Amino acid sequence: MGKDSFTPLYDGGDSSHVHLNKFGSNQLSQSKKSWIARNFSRRECIRFVPKSHDVSRCKCGRPRERHSQQALESGQGSEEWNVASCTTKHPTNAYGEIDFEGYGGQKRAPYLRMSHDTDANLVITLMLKRWNLEIPNLVISVTGGAKSFVLKPRLREMFRRGLIKAAKTTGAWIITGGTNTGVMKHVGEAVKEQQLMFGSDTQVNVIGIATWGIVDKQSDLISEKNGKYPALYSMEPTPGHQGAMLDPNHSHFFLVDDGTEGKYGVEIGMRSRIEEAIMKVKTDSRSEAGSIGVPVVLLVLEGGPNTVATMYELIKKKVPAVVIDGSGRAASVVGFAYNHTIKRNVDGQTINVIDPQYEDEVRAKVVEVFGAKGADKTYSMIKDVLEDEKMISVYSLDGEISQDIDLAILKALLKANRSSPVAQLNLALAWNRIDLAKSDIFTEEQQWTTETLSAAMLTALLDDKAEFAELFLQNGLSMREFLSLDILCKLYAEVPGNTTIKPLLQKEMGKRQVKTIDMDVVGEVIEELMGDMFESYYRKDGHYFGELASYAEGLVLKNRKSSKDLLANINRIDPLPTPYLDVFLWAVLCNRRELARVLWEAGREPMAAALMASRLLKRMASRAQEDNTITDISSDLYDHARLFEERAVGVLDECFNENETLSQTLLVRELDHYSRMTALELAVSAESQDFIAHTSCQVLLTRLWMGTMAMNTRWWKVLVCLYLPVLIFPIIYFVPDEQHERQAAEREHQKSLNQKSSKVKSHKEKNDAPVVPVYRSKEEKAVSNDEEARVGTENEEEDFQLEDYIPEIREDDSMEVIMRNKKLGFCDRIMHFYSAPFSKFVGNVVGYLAFIFLYAYVVLFNFPRFDPAKTLGGIHPTEIVLYFWVFTILIEEIRQLAAKPPKYIKDKVSVYFSDTWNFVDIFSLTVFIIAIILRFFTNSRIFTASRIILSLDIIFFIVRSLQIFSVNRLLGPKLVMIQKMMQDLAQFIIILAVFTIAYGIALHAVMFPSPGIYARNNTWVTITSVVQYPYWQMYGELFLDEIQGEKPKEFGEVDPDGRWLSPLLLAIYMVFTNILLLNLLIAIFNYTFERVQEDSDKVWKFQRYDLVQEYHSRPVFAPPLVLLGHILIFIRWVWRMCRCGHPPRGSTMKIGLSPAEMEQMDNWEFQAAEMYIHQQQQKNSGTLEERVRALGDRVDCINSQLNRVLDSMSGTRAHALTDGNGLEGGHDSEGRLARMEVELSSNSESLQKILALLQQQPPVKGQAAVPIQLTLLHYKARSSPYPGSTAKRFAVQDNMVDWQVPFPDYKPVNYTAPVVLANPVWADKDLMAMSPRPELPYNQMDHTCNVNRVSYNGTYVVKDGLPLNPMGRTGMQGRGLLGRFGPNHAADPVVTRWKRTSAGVMLQGGKKVLEFVAIQRKDNNQWAIPGGMVEPGQLVTQALKAEFGEEAMAKLNVSQEEKERIAKQIERLFQQGQEIYKGYVDDPRNTDNAWMETVAVNFHDDKGDLFGDITLQAGDDAAAVRWQRVSGNIPLYASHVSILEKVAKMRDAAF
């Protein structure tokens, strides 16, 4: 092979025009073209051996005239002819690209004529390196009939669709014989159809391997030099030629030459070797474990004896075969034989053999199809082919998988690897077929562990196969066991080069001069993207990414052979602390959307993770924008960041709806793995305006802003009390005061109830369940506090007692101090008032205004020149006060700089100056200090400079006061507008300067040419005039008289030529500046204004955070008294350093939680995230597109079944007409066909109506997709496995549910649970085991068992002594878990109230939000309405109260008096119930003979007072109980969602 053997010869991309550049004779070098000629050869006959029956033709198939004289002479006297001795090799003369004339839309197909003994590896090199084909994940070798044959229309359609689908979804190559006949033509037509439907961009690689000697029009392909580019190939066959045309729909051709002509089958051996060589090529994957040998599968369609021989040879090489039964000849014979095989044990091995009863029939078919000659050999090969059941699969059009022939092809390979589930998984991964993995690999029988899934998981991560990663996480893979430091580093080492993060990693590696990526490099890059406040734990956590990494590296160096095992053991002993977060960050940095989503959904702390992802993606998008070559990546990154921002807001919304208080705790808790930042800080860092604008954040900021003062405290009260502290007590209202008043009102209310209840005699109702409250500890309050309504009016606020949730309060954390509620003493009130950010703000505003007035007074009235002879240099005392005031402001700015979170001063400065106001502060203070220094010089000019600087500096101090307006909702956004317009103006000035300077220079050069009498000799005047006059002219001061030379004394003498040219230049200049540029500036300002105005509310809310954060951390006093606060801070710092060894944390907007509290909060947040994810999935599945797609799938299924029936009916009719009773049979068939047509017409009309209904009524946003056919068809009652068992129901399609529909093959599974068969008192006798069966009193009251057997749905049918489910078949007979045959009556009390927040009753979409008492079932952990079975002799009303008490209220040891009080309140509630539903329940426990029916009654606590002080506590029958929001997005047990929907409609509530 030449030195240029890896130089690409063919570009597999868009080739219809690219070949002109790449393969034209002018561009393609001679050396590249000759590579093929040097490495591939053809064969020519060198010995003419005449045929016995035709002496004019050689045994090679060519006539005498096509042989050389030497060949004619050497063949004289010879009778034997063979390829080895009678042919010789020559460089190939047929290669290039075929352009099929008349097929202009087709891409040109590369082709090559080669010898039959060519090295197969050389062919693979040609395809991969020269023709640039991608390594396939599968090779489908199609074989069969070489001559034209007819397929049934439906089989032809299935074959075409399935073959192309298999190739496209797996990235497969299809190999055929390449000619335009037989099975090859069917394959070509399938490809053509696919390209017509989806365009030529979706090309499938179809490789034709044909015999050169049978190809028609060989001369069109031959070129003695440099190949043909293109080779024009006409599809008109040559008259009289016995060969075949090449198929124009193939993409590549190999023409195998053994020197013969007209001989078929020459290519078989070469094709087999090529396929064998392909199997040794590894598939393309970033993971070594993900690279497998390319699998090959044989697809057999029709065919003759050679087809059977091909199957035989390939199956011996362990290539599985798929036979299309019903396609004719060989395929049908093999299919028939396969369907009549039995298993037999031979020499300890189980093999398939043809059933002896059918051997003669199979032999007869072989003779019938192939003829008697060679029948025994063919039969023997068929027997051998069928022996290994794993290696052969028969696809039947009428079989169970007839709808998906692609699955049959792929499952054949899985079947061949049945003994190795890991190999099967690798195949599914390579094909990216998640459907196969779910249905055939991850089954109940196969158990998976982290160890077996680790390699596949690494492949899924590296190859961005998110669905597989999700599947692995759901089926036994533990991320904690899987992820090690070694794998994490490998993930970052394999980051694709086209990502934004790759250059950043390489840059950091270059700085450190390292060749491999370690986590310290990654941590540095993450810190760079996150900003100076963030400190990655990859860098600071020395245990996991420092000491452990070094220890592991040392072990690897010492024990190279077992390094993987050592690292795995280390990972088991001491796993990484946050594996999900680690891999999630990698996926985000690689911008892998679906993978990031999967890992985010599975990980912890979803809100913080989403916000961090948003920040990282936005920063990477900003970096990408700086590179103009990757702007598309930038937009994609921004869109990805927006998705995570939406997810963070969604999780926060769920948390807030569930519990307002805990949601605010989530916002301010310290997160260890996020550099001890809070979710609020991460949101600000990510500039997430939507997140900060959320109600939860804004309520929290309001609470922090007001401190412990009531939220409605007016500013003037604060202003008065700042200077008259004694008025704090009468006019300032504090939050703890409200709490204590509310608690006092509760106690009074309880006292009055106790007094009334003491007059009532103790009594106990017969059937009432005990309902009593429970004493709550702080821990229990943490779960139930927000779920209990408070006694009072409808508009009262909920309790906000953070110490109930966060009991660990530390003195140095002012955040916790602010949010605590405790009784305030005299000093506490004063301290809390002055430490509130709002009070600090008012004090600072007043102080700053006083400072401005003092500054103005000094500058305007008392700023004398410094005189050393006078006392204090003659400086006025007010000026000294001003100096001291500025000094205190400077000290405060230094304190703010030192208090910034970053550790290093450089990072502190960076964070400090990220706030524009801080830059203004430092600039104005620096200028002030310069002015004061100059002020003390006695030189008059220096003093004047000092006075001027000081006078100008006041501008910046006054402008600084604009920050005061940021607290206002209307004026705050205006400041943002001004800031953004200043940025626009800076860019505009650059453009304006170009025009101004250009015009100024031209104008001056025209008016005052130099040198000469009109030249100006003053350089400074010349320079200033170049800028001065154009600038003022822009504002309307045109200087017309001056530029026209009418004022020579003032302006100077103007050159005569300039007098007429200057006005013309001015006119042009004014057009550009005043008309074009200034209007452009106005348009830019207008756009900025509209953009900010649209989100003005969000902008203001986002600004609030900075304001609250600044004043939350400020000392109590404003300058100049702030110095006292600094002294106190210093004293405290010294005290803590001496006592504890570390400085105080200072005043922060954070809450520190104990590990146990963090765990509880994490679990609660994770549950809220799961709810949000479920709602999003419901929303997506409820879209019109998804519903139409699902409906389309079902229509396809129905269509397939109907076609199958029609085919069967057609066959029956044809058979009947040829039978002796043809007339009668014909009439019967006609009648059935007529009925079928009627049914088809009816189905078509129904489908059209369904589609119209879907289009007219799209789903309401956020509304759940509640099954409309709940009353028509049962779904959960047909689900498998049956609850509490492994029993699976008989499959019943929707159209077969009705008992009226004939279903002769219906064989329901008989199942009754052992607990029911034990014959408890609540169960009937087992009628299924009795013969004859005794008749129970169905459809009436059973007085013997004291059970009502009347159905709420009316009379039900009784057959063979058993009742039939009125809703239809369920696939199971017996009773399952139900005790009674027939209806089993239940009672479901739906106890509701209005959901309240601190602002009153919650509203959604203008409607009130309901919440109901929900219990978590112990058997399946699903949430449900509390309810249960109606016991024998029990009334429904009694059952409602009893079930509510048993499942929602615990049996607690409280006083009898308290029991009576609670019982009375429950009695009041249950006296006002409204029936919601009465009838059948779609319950998974239902069977054909036993089913659930219920009565659902709504008991509504409208004012919220009945449950105000009653605690919900799960009983023995429930795992948990809580108040749950009524929403269609919440998954509930059985048909409870539809019941709640009825409640919401009745109450006109949101759903």
UniProtKB/Swiss-Prot annotation:
Residues 1-714, 731-837, 899-916, 969-980, 1081-1116, 1136-1551 are cytoplasmic. Residues 1394-1546 form the Nudix hydrolase domain. Residues 715-730, 1019-1034, 1117-1135 dip into the membrane without crossing it. Changing residue 1110 to A: Mild loss of Ca(2+) sensitivity and increased sensitivity to phosphatidylinositol 4,5-bisphosphate-mediated activation. GO terms for cellular component: plasma membrane. Ca(2+) binds at residues 893, 896, 918, 921. It is found in: Cell membrane. One of its GO terms (biological process) is calcium ion transmembrane transport. A motif (Prevents fast channel inactivation) lies at residues 1040-1042. Changing residue 918 to A: Severe loss of Ca(2+) sensitivity and increased sensitivity to phosphatidylinositol 4,5-bisphosphate-mediated activation. Residues 1184-1209 form a coiled coil. It is a multi-pass membrane protein. Homotetramer. This is Transient receptor potential cation channel subfamily M member-like 2.
